[in-house]
Structure formats: C-alpha cells, structure tokens
C-alpha cells in the first residue's frame, strides 16, 4: 500500500467516526500526530470529550483538530480577547501566533491560571477564536537557553512544519513485513560507562536509544557507528533518555552527517541537552580541539525534536510505538518503553534511573502496560556498591561543612550542572535557613545557574513536595538569596582570597571548567575540603583522586603545566547519587509490573555488569545477558 492510499484510508476512517456536522477539509500527518482541518464553527461538537476519546481509540493514533485559516479570528482581536479573558494574576507575557499550525502560544508565569479549572479558559479561546491555545511557562529565573530555543522555533515555524510533514510521511508509511524480528545492537555503553547508544531494529524500522559521548576518554569518544547494520539514512528515530552528555552528546553529529529524522524526549531534556551541547562546543574551542559538530547542527537537532510528556503513547515508526516514563535520575529523565508490532513484543530501557524519591524528583516508575525485555543500568551494580541512605549522607554533609567552615576553610563540591547541583542547592538552602550550618556565601559557578533556571521553568517534572512548595506555597529554594552566581575570573580570585564559603562548580568529574581552577587554588591547604557527590567515570581526574592520587598536573590558560599537590581533605558522599544502588536495583526488579522475561545489563564497569547479571539470574530467576559493545541480541 502506498503512502497516498494509507492517507486516504485514514481520512475515510476519521470522517466515518466524526459527527456529521463536522466538515473535514484537509488531513495532514504532522510528525506522530494526525492534524484534522475543518471549517465547521460547531466547535462544541469537536470538543466533546467522548468524540475525541472514541476517535483516538478507534484510530490508535494521536489526533488534533485545527481550523482553516479563513475561520481563525484576527490575531490582534484574538490577543485582546485572551487578555480580557485571563486574570492578570496569570502574569501573561508574550502572545504569539503560529500560522502554519493554527496555534496561539501564551507565555505566562502561572500557566495554570491561563488554562483555568478543567481547561475552561482554553475551551473558551478555541470556541471564540478558532485558534488552538498552547501555554508555556516564563522561567522565574531567566534562561538564555530557553530564550534561544523559543526564539529559534518562532523564527523557523514554517521550517518546523515542513520537517513534521516529512517525519509524518515516514512514520505512517505502511509496514512491509508481517513477521516481526527484533534485534538490539550494542553500539556503546555496554560493560562501560559512557557513549550510551543502542540500535533497535525490526525488518521495517531502525531506532536509536541515546547517542552519547565517552566523557572519560577523548581519544575514543563515539559509539561504534562503523558497524554494517548502522546507517544514518535508514534511521527512523532517535530517543534520548536524559540530557547528560554520555547519553545525548553525539546527537548533533548525526545531523552533520545527514540525519533528518526526529528526536523524541521530554521538554526539559531538549532544553538541557541543547545547553550542554552548546557548552561542549565552547569547551572544545577553548581547549583548541575540533568539535565534532557545530552550532548549526545543534540548531538542526532542536528543530527536529518532538517533545513528549510522560505516559503519552506515540507512533514513531510503522511498527513501533513509544511511551516515556519517569526514571528519577535528573530533571526530565525517562525510561523508554517500546511497543513493537501489534503487541508482539514490549521492551523497556531504564536509562540512568533512581528507585528512591529525592528532594528533587519522584522515584522511577515500576508500572508498565507490558514488558517482555528489560535493559537496565549497572552503574552501582557491584556487590560492594552499598550506597548510604540519603538521610545518612545529608547528616554527614552537614558535619563536614560545619567542621570545615569552623576551621576557616572552604568547601569545593564539583557537580554536574544538571541533577546533583540542584539537589544540593535545596539541601544547602534548608541548612542555612534553619541554622544547621553557618550563614556563609554559597557560590555557583559554571552552567549550574543556567541549568537551575531551566529547572524553574519545569515544576511539573519535580517531586510532588517541591512542586507543592513552588506552585502553592510560594517557596522556591532555587531563588534563595543565599546563592551567588560567579561569572568572571576576577570574582573567582576574590572567592579564593576570601573567607570561608561553599563552592559548587562544574565539571563534576574535574575534567575541565571552573571546578579544576578552584581545586588548583585550594588543593594544598589542609583547612579546605573537596566533596564528591556524583559518579566519577574511570579516566577522569575525579576518579583518580577518589582512588588515592594526591597530585595532578594543572595546565593554565597559557598552556603551562604545573604539578599540584593535594593536601585538602577529600570525601565521597555516594548517597546523593542519581543512580540506583545494587539494593535499589533489586527492589525495582522485584516490584516492576509486569515482570520481564529477559533482563539485559549495561551502563557499568565490566565487573559490575557481569556481577549484576549473575545476581539477577540466581536470585530473581530471570534469563539475563550482559553483552559487550558490538554484540547483537535477538529479542524476537
């Protein structure tokens, strides 16, 4: 069956299932959505919930209604109508119009007031203007990344519409084969931590799960793209579990070499990935090393990204449906559920996950519609990986901070910009405001402030407790006056020469960035303290210090090398990790519903992957595999 015949079949099915008073003028595949255009003014009939639900149930596809251009109200009149309808308490900012898709985009500090109780305001806007309203949140902290992305999408709306139409054609093409064979190709991140990349293949489709960098080994950065089964031309989709560079850092590289398909991830993951990819280009420029991609490639990736909410079933290929679920690792991080064929096989990729609620995030999901195969991480999957509880680690952190500050020292905490940084900001705000530690400056350096601004724009992805504080109690710990952002070398010099303080700086593994600069300045003074709170990839300076190395070579901006002795105190607080411990992995596997038939282990040092795989097989009586990079696993 050709694409045109498939389009006609779907159109006929939609018309048959709509009320007779609704006139359909055009149907388009906009990416995974079917856009139905109408000239009917009887919006109430279209808005009837049973009609939409019944249609989606029959079609098994996402359907959105739009009105013809000549039916839409004048933009100026529509804007006036919205401003008169919505309370001033909603803090409406810019109102813009996407003429290519018939949407009015309303930016607001309080989107809930724009939406109204049970969506009443959105319904009023649709009924009276024939525009589809869409709300976006104004970040309480200004974000350069969000501003850049929103400006780009506003400028390139026709380009994005054209991209969606092309993606839609590929998604909704007829499947050629009835017999479903599924292969999982290990292209990176197997028996190692870094460059996560999994190629899922059927006879009809090719989908990549994560495309990451090897951050600990700049000489071997990329996944194994050279294998014969991988072809950029044949890729149907790329799905990103979360925004850390070892999972998303190579995405723009695909567009540099011809990929023109979609990226699926959550909205926070898109924004944070863009921030980190642009920063990676900057770091390469500063270090004088060639970047594997350009800002243009990052822009291309943004234009091809289709953000998804958790729990929303989405067609991504003729024989694959995707659903994202919370993984509890960092903001917007997701477990990836793939539904193959007509229920023939269901596969879950956990990505990095945390099966424990934290101050920042809810714990990972354990309930899925169906699961036959599970791919799970083993970062802390070794028998020796007994991570202390979060409460124990917070208590120890408090003691370390107090002892360091009382002896007049400074505390350096290297952190990844996304995840542990925000968790620590919440803890430190409570410690200082409650008087648990002395009121000293808390300096934030590197990308932390920008990443935190993106967190403030996405409260719906935060833990229920934190969301309640921010949205309903007006208490946002990220806006605390205790935190001071550092933005220049002069400010860093003042901090180093100043009194007791706490410094949060990137990078978390001491592979570059201001954290290395601070370490060089503070390292030899025994009054100071260095605290690690996140996983240190093998080969990084952070990993070497944890293993007992007490000196390192520091290269200054002129390229001169200096040997630095480490005399400060060093602590590791693994309880703040965003990864699950071995016991938490076991709990997850005992509680996941339904139980998978086969469990595959990745994302861990070789010994940990093998050990975890063996434990799961023996104790949980599951068929397990711990493949190496380049191995292929036949799932069905």
Swiss-Prot record:
Region (KHa): 4-72
Group of enzyme by EC: hydrolase
Region Metallo-beta-lactamase C-terminus: start-end pairs: 578-636
Annotated spans, KHb: 73-140
Keyword set, alphabetical order: DNA-binding, Endonuclease, Exonuclease, Hydrolase, Metal-binding, Nuclease, RNA-binding, Transcription, Transcription regulation, Transcription termination, Zinc
Co-factor(s): Zn(2+)
The EC number(s) this enzyme carries: 3.1.-.-
Protein's name according to its UniProt entry: Transcription termination factor FttA
CDD domains documented for this protein: KH-II_CPSF_arch_rpt1, TTHA0252-CPSF-like_MBL-fold
Species, as recorded: Lokiarchaeum sp. (strain GC14_75)
Annotated segments matching region Metallo-beta-lactamase N-terminus: 181-383
Entry keyword annotation includes Transferase: no
Binding site for Zn(2+) 1: 242, 244, 329, 352
Gene3D superfamilies, sorted: 3.30.300.20, 3.30.300.230, 3.40.50.10890, Ribonuclease Z/Hydroxyacylglutathione hydrolase-like
Lineage: Archaea, Promethearchaeati, Promethearchaeota, Promethearchaeia, Promethearchaeales
Any one GO BP annotation for this protein: DNA-templated transcription termination
Annotated family: Belongs to the metallo-beta-lactamase superfamily. RNA-metabolizing metallo-beta-lactamase-like family. FttA subfamily.
Chain residue ranges for the region called Beta-Casp: 384-577
């Amino acid at each position: 069956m050709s694409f045109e015949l498939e389009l006609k079949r779907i159109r006929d099915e939609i018309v048959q299932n709509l009320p007779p008073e609704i006139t359909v003028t055009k149907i388009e595949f906009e990416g995974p959505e079917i856009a139905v255009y109408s000239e009917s003014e009887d919006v109430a009939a279209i808005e009837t919930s049973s009609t939409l639900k019944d249609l989606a149930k029959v079609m098994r596809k996402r359907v959105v209604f739009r009105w013809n251009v000549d039916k839409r109200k004048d933009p100026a009149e529509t804007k006036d109508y919205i401003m008169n309808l919505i309370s001033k308490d909603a803090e409406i900012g810019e109102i813009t119009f996407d003429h290519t898709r018939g949407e009015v985009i309303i930016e607001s500090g309080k989107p809930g007031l724009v939406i109204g109780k049970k969506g009443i305001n959105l319904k009023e806007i649709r009924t009276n203007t024939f525009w589809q309203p869409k709300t976006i949140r104004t970040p309480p902290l200004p974000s350069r990344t969000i501003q850049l992305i929103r400006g780009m999408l506003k400028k390139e709306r026709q380009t994005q519409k054209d991209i969606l139409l092309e993606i839609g054609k590929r998604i909704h093409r007829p499947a050629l084969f009835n017999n479903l064979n599924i292969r999982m190709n290990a292209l990176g991140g197997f028996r190692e931590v870094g460059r996560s990349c999994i190629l899922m293949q059927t006879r009809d489709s090719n989908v990549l799960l994560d495309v990451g960098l090897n951050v600990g080994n700049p000489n071997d950065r990329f996944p194994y793209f050279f294998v014969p089964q991988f072809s950029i031309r044949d890729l149907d989709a790329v799905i990103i579990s979360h925004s850390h560079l070892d999972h998303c850092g190579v995405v723009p590289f695909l567009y540099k070499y011809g990929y023109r398909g979609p990226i699926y991830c959550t909205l926070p993951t898109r924004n944070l990935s863009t921030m980190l990819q642009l920063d990676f280009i900057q770091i390469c420029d500063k270090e004088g090393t060639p970047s594997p991609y350009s800002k243009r490639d990052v822009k291309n990736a943004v234009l091809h990204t289709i953000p998804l909410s958790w729990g929303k079933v989405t067609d991504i290929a003729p024989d694959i449906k995707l659903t994202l679920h919370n993984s509890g690792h960092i903001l917007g991080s997701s477990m990836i559920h793939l539904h193959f064929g007509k229920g023939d096989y269901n596969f879950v990729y956990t990505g990095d996950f945390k099966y424990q609620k934290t101050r920042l995030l809810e714990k990972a999901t354990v309930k899925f519609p169906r699961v036959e195969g599970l791919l799970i991480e083993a970062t802390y999957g070794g028998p020796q990986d007994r991570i202390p509880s979060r409460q124990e680690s917070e208590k120890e952190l408090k003691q370390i901070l107090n002892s360091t500050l009382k002896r007049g020292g400074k505390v350096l905490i290297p952190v990844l910009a996304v995840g542990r940084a925000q968790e620590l900001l919440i803890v430190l705000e409570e410690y200082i405001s409650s008087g648990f530690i002395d009121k000293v400056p808390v300096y934030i350096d590197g990308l932390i402030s920008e990443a935190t601004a993106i967190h403030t724009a996405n409260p719906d992805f935060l833990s229920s407790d934190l969301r309640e504080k921010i949205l309903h109690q007006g208490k946002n710990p990220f806006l605390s006056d205790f935190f001071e952002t550092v933005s220049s070398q002069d400010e860093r010099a003042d901090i180093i020469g100043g009194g007791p303080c706490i410094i949060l700086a990137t990078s978390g593994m001491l592979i570059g960035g201001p954290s290395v600069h601070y370490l060089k300045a503070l390292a030899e003074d025994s009054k100071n303290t260095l605290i690690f709170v996140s996983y240190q990839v093998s080969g990084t300076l952070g990993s070497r210090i944890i293993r007992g190395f007490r000196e390192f070579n520091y290269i200054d901006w002129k390229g001169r090398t200096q040997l630095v002795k480490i005399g400060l105190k060093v602590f590791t607080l693994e309880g703040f990790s965003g990864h699950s411990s071995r016991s938490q992995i076991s709990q997850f596997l005992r509680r996941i519903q339904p139980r998978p038939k086969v469990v595959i282990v990745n994302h861990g040092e070789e010994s940990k992957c093998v050990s975890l795989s063996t434990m799961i097989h023996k104790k949980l009586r599951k068929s397990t595999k711990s493949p190496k990079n380049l191995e292929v696993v036949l799932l069905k």
